[in-house]
Structures are given as structure tokens and as C-alpha cells.
Regions:
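Hydrophobic core of transmembrane alpha-helices in multi-pass small-molecule transporters
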Residues: 43-59
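Intracellular juxtamembrane helix-capping segments at the cytosolic ends
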Residues: 59-72
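Multi-pass alpha-helical transporter architecture, strongest
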Residues: 31-39, 115-140
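Small/hydrophobic positions within alpha-helical transmembrane segments
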Residues: 29, 52, 84-91, 121
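A late C-terminal transmembrane helix in Major Facilitator Superfamily
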Residues: 1, 71-105
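Cytoplasmic membrane-interface "Motif A"-like loop-to-helix N-cap segments
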Residues: 10-26
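A membrane-interface helix-boundary motif in multi-pass transporters
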Residues: 18-21, 101-118
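Interfacial helix-cap and linker-helix signal at transmembrane-aqueous boundaries
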Residues: 7-8, 12, 99-107
Length: 140
């Protein structure tokens, strides 16, 4: 998380999309983590997955609120962050149910691969559509 915050703070000084890019790098690191968890069979795979996921998710999560601040006025940030968190919790609940079904059918690796694909789509959407104009959005 600290690495993601520091990198993002420095990068946004040179490029207004620096926070988006830092978050995207972090999100990208979760893809191999999910694949290693789904298909790996050694301690090396588990440790690699843990490192990729820990660093990646930390970089991603450290930038959610700062990115939100680039698009949402301070008047609505608490609401926007609440919606963001609610969506995350809802998706987490769906993933738990989905992975349980994959596990019951003996194809848990396929479930993790599906999640990696969904993360890839989210990554592409993030890079393509998040185009901040300012570092701190203010209503005029």
C-alpha cells in the first residue's frame, strides 16, 4: 500500500493519469496471482501468488480514493466512496458463491481463471475510460 501511494503521488505530478496507471499496474499484478492460485501446485506458486496479490492489491487499493477525488466533488465523495465499497462487498459475496460452486464441481482452477479474465476486462476499462482532467475535482 505504501509503495502504491508513494508511486502514485510522484507519478501524478508528472502525468495526471499517474494514479490511474499505478492502480492499473496493481490490478494487473492480481491476474497472475489468480492464475497461480488456480493452477499452481507448488509452494513456489503459492508464494508467487501471495507476492503478486499483496503488492498488486495494495497498489490498486491505495489509489481508489485518490482516483475518486479526481472525478467527484468533495460534496459527494462520501456517497461515491460508499457506493464503491458497497459494490466491492457485493462482488466479493458473488465471488465467494461462485468459487464454492467451482470447488464443488472440482474445477476451482477454472473459477480462478474466470476471475482473472474479469480482472483483465476491468483493467482494460480502467485504462480506457478513466481520464482525469485534474488532481482534485472541485465544483465551480
Amino acid at each position: 500500500v505504501i509503495l502504491g501511494g508513494i508511486l502514485s503521488d510522484k507519478w501524478v505530478q508528472k502525468n495526471i493519469k499517474g494514479r490511474v496507471y499505478t492502480s492499473a499496474i496493481g490490478l494487473g499484478l492480481t491476474i497472475p496471482a489468480l492464475l497461480l492460485l488456480g493452477f499452481g501446485s507448488s509452494m513456489f506458486n503459492v508464494v508467487g501468488a501471495a507476492l503478486c496479490f499483496g503488492i498488486g492489491y495494495g497498489m490498486f487499493d491505495a489509489n481508489n480514493m485518490p482516483i475518486l477525488c479526481q472525478f467527484v466533488s468533495s460534496k459527494y465523495r462520501a456517497t461515491a466512496y460508499g457506493v464503491l465499497n458497497m459494490t466491492g462487498v457485493g462482488c466479493g459475496a458473488l465471488v465467494t458463491s461462485l468459487l464454492g460452486k467451482y470447488s464443488d464441481s472440482g474445477t476451482l482452477g477454472d473459477g480462478f481463471a474466470l476471475m482473472a479474465g474479469i480482472v483483465l476486462v476491468a483493467l482494460l476499462v480502467q485504462i480506457s475510460f478513466l481520464r482525469p482532467k485534474v488532481n482534485d475535482f472541485v465544483d465551480e
